[in-house]
Curated annotation (Swiss-Prot):
PANTHER family: ACYL TRANSFERASE 4 (PTHR31147), OS10G0105900 PROTEIN (PTHR31147:SF54)
Keyword Transferase among record annotations: yes
EC number(s) recorded for this UniProt protein: 2.3.1.-
GO molecular function, one term: hydroxycinnamoyltransferase activity
Lineage of producing organism: Eukaryota, Viridiplantae, Streptophyta, Embryophyta, Tracheophyta
Protein name, UniProt field: Spermidine hydroxycinnamoyltransferase 2
Top-level taxonomic group: Eukaryota
Amino acid sequence: MKLDSFTARRGNPELVAPARATPRETKPLSDLDDHWDLRYLQPSLEFFRVVDGDRRPARPGDGIKAALAEALVYYYPIAGRLRELPTGHMLAVECTAEGVVFVEAEADVALEDFGEPLMPTFHGAEGFLCDVGDTRVIVGRPLFYLQITYLKCGGFVLGTYMCHCIADAFGTIQFLKAIVDIARGEAKPTTLPVWERELFLATSLQPHIKEDQKKLFDELESTTCDDIMVTMPTENMVSEYFILSQIDMAALRRHVPLNLNKTVTSFELLTAVTWRSRTIALGYRPCHIVRLMIVVNARGRWKKLPLGYYGNGLLCSVIETTVNDLCTNPLGHTIELVRKAKDEMKTEENMQLRVDLLPLWREKPYIKVQRIFEACDIKWIGQDTLDIGWAKRIGGGIPTVSPPNLTSYQFLCKNEKGEKSTVISMLLPQPAMDRFKKEMAAWLIE
């Protein structure tokens, strides 16, 4: 059964406030949080199978709702509202304790109807998510939405929207883990939250801009564009997931030269192959400049970031080359390009430079850079730690809902054989998607 073949019967939405009194204050966002490209509600889905036990509530939603209220005591800014400051069109959080949205729903389907083990694609996932309207409207409205959908098998789905200005994917999982920790019976979250958004504020009013970065800024001000990935509305594209088994990964590694085979990571290899395949599929001319944007998690790399930081902590590095250079050289050359982009974020000095550039990006119009491929590794995001005790997580991830995301995510799941596999998301026009599939299939031929 496909996810688009059922109807969820939703109850009335209600606001859930923190379980106890919380500070009333205004909290500014970081320069990274306040980036215009993050001003939207990010969806996610988590599927659970209920297990027997003494702590199992008669109705899972009661336990989740109570845990949500308790978690908001610690994560109280999430219960507030975004306001636009008088100057600079910048946002801040008013900690008003107005609450987040909670909805209960029912659907006459079972976990088994979606295939076992559960894997993407999550087409039609809107049934598991609150009706939030325009996901780009974030000021003056709730910052978090949670819908629990009961399935006829006794399992349930947690569908959430988190305002991306408040938390990135890692921070969102941290908040969800706080909820499930308390629902499991813990007195408080196992990881306590840290706000400290000043850690991602620019420290230089006149940062040094490298030549390649200047070209990006100049392009944002350009009024001409011939890249279909920019000119075509994302709603007219198709989004698909590609699942690569361990056998598939072994087939890809056979294309890697010996001097790189033992050191290349799965992210580097998959990013190199998908970047080349996508570039060919889009039909860019050999002389065109193409770019790769690597999204790097600063957690664990930047010593000043404390455990529990749940704000946006993903920084980007960009490299460029020509289509001819990318697609006619051996795969090892592409892997080296990917590594070059990753290495840009190796030093704390370079990470601070990226932060110092953020205010300049805010002044630019909301235009996507031409012929750029954005890759993000969320394989170790921590979804497998969502242990409620009386319910076991069996799958989940980022669903395909409007507006689609241009970023290509890599994450983990189990395939039909129960083997750990890597999933890649891809958004393309339909003709390009057809060509992309053929290019990927060619790489997987042993």
